[in-house]
Every structure is written in structure tokens, then in C-alpha cells.
A protein has these predicted regions:
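Hydrophobic residues in beta-strands and at strand termini
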Residues: 20-21, 66, 116
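Conserved interaction-surface patches within small, structured recognition/assembly domains
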Residues: 57-69, 75-83, 98
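HotDog/MaoC-like acyl-thioester-processing domains
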Residues: 3-4, 9-14, 72, 83-184
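Active-site-flanking beta-strand signature of metal-NTP-handling nucleotidyl enzymes
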Residues: 15-19
Length: 184
């Protein structure tokens, strides 16, 4: 197997800008979170595919922070960068900003991290190029992603523990003082 040449994050950095139209609004008059999630998935795909040179799929969305609402008529720019690469996976950092075109006010509205996996022609995970860390920001993002991966693995073990079957006495103790009523 040939060795893949490392690519800098600048190679695959992607920005998508879209006007927020009335049909994107929720009942509160702001842009629906699902619209923003769909756009984030699009920029994550474009970024990961550009880095890997392959078709990519979303395998997880680690966090989506909704920091500020987005209004109808604003321009939203979604910026994606490869923060980490594994063998076939990549963690894509996404920053979303909105611009009020009337006031020229720019607001950071969302931050998110998508884990993408590159697929080969056989639809199986395929190796991606290493990431060339060229700046202190690149190094910081890569290290943060290592910690994010570690936390994610610990969280998965924690979730498994939560889902364990509990004995009835433990359940009674857990529910004591909670705002619930048991009807069975």
C-alpha cells in the first residue's frame, strides 16, 4: 500500500455561505436548528471529502452548540476544517457565523464537531491522508480533538453503565425525591 502524503488543513478548508430565507424559519421566527444542522452536515461532507479524496459519511455529531439565534434575511457562513485524522476517520470542526446585512453585524452562532469516515469504491472505510500541522492553531485543534475522542470513549462506557438492568430496590432509591410518579 502506498504511503499517502500529508495534507494541511488549509488544503481542505471549506466555507459555504447561504441566505436565510423565510421558509427556513421556525415558529419563533428564527432559523430552525434543523436547517443549520443540515448545512453543517453539508460543510462537514465537503471538507472531509476534499481532504480524503473520497466519498464520506457522517458517523457522529459530537456537539452542536447553539450560541445565538439566526434571523431571516441574514447571511450564514459555515466554515469547516479538518481538526484530526485517524485511519479512515476525520473530525471536522465547524464554525457558523451570521451576518446581518443591514447592520453589518457578524455573530458567532454555532460550533460543532462532526466525525466523518471516508469510504472506498467497495463501500468500506478507506485510509485518509495524514494531517500536516502547520500552525499553532492546527496543533491546538488536533490536541483538543484527541481529548474529545478520549472523552467520547469514556462517555460511551458511561452510557453502557446507565443502560444496565437495575434491581427494584436500587430503582426505588434512585427515584426517591425525583419529580416523577411510578404507575406500574
Amino acid at each position: 500500500m502506498e504511503k499517502l502524503e500529508a495534507r494541511p488543513s488549509s488544503f481542505s478548508r471549506v466555507t459555504i455561505t447561504e441566505l436565510m430565507i423565510p421558509s427556513y424559519a421556525n415558529f419563533g421566527g428564527k432559523i430552525h436548528g434543523g436547517i443549520l444542522l443540515s448545512l453543517m452536515d453539508k460543510v462537514a461532507y465537503a471538507t472531509a471529502s476534499k481532504h480524503s479524496g473520497a466519498y464520506c459519511v457522517t458517523v457522529s455529531v459530537d456537539t452542536v452548540d447553539f450560541l445565538q439565534p439566526v434571523g431571516v434575511g441574514e447571511l450564514v457562513s459555515l466554515m469547516g476544517s479538518v481538526n484530526y485524522v485517524g485511519n479512515s476517520s476525520m473530525i471536522i470542526g465547524i464554525k457558523v457565523i451570521s451576518e446581518n446585512v443591514k447592520t453589518a453585524t457578524v455573530t458567532h452562532t454555532n460550533t460543532s464537531y462532526f466525525t466523518m469516515v471516508a469510504k472506498g469504491d467497495d463501500d468500506r472505510p478507506t485510509t485518509v491522508p495524514p494531517l500536516m500541522l502547520e500552525t499553532k492553531t492546527d496543533i491546538r485543534r488536533f490536541v483538543e480533538a484527541i481529548y474529545r475522542k478520549k472523552f467520547k470513549m469514556e462517555h460511551a462506557a458511561y452510557q453502557k453503565e446507565i443502560k444496565k438492568n437495575r434491581d427494584p430496590e436500587e430503582i426505588k432509591r434512585l427515584l426517591a425525591g425525583e419529580r416523577c410518579e411510578v404507575g406500574v
